[in-house]
Amino acid sequence: MREKMIMTVFAVAAFSTNVAYAQLRKIPAEVTNVFTDKFPNATNIEWQDQLVDYKATFTDDGKNYSVKFSNNGEWKITERIIKKDFLPKSVIKGFSKGEYAKWEIKEVTIVEMPDYKKHFKITVAKNNLNKRDLLYNADGQLVKDNFTF
């Protein structure tokens, strides 16, 4: 009985390792080349394979960023966490007039995407289960309101 238990443990461990390893793909050259062109001074780069795209977290000029690229190297989004004190007055004004003004601000991010100029994402929470990502343009207009975890 003990032998079967030990063999089962080894089999599960071996299978688990193979499954975890199978999820990792090599980052395509198309992705890394576009990344290097866009962020030539990036340091502390860490890549994540998110199956439908690739995400890199890195430091550039002392600031922490995350960026996503499609599988073929198309730039999708860049985000950088900032302090809420660095939000433009127009965004603060727009947020303070909105329905989530009394919710707790959890995180503020500068967001850049190919289709948008610079935007500002404010993640707010009413409680542990009720959280929203609010995307504002530079004029302080709410562009997107998404439920988040």
Per-segment meaning from a language model:
Residues M1-K26, F35:
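Bacterial Sec-dependent N-terminal signal peptides
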Residues Q23-F149:
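Interaction-mediating elements
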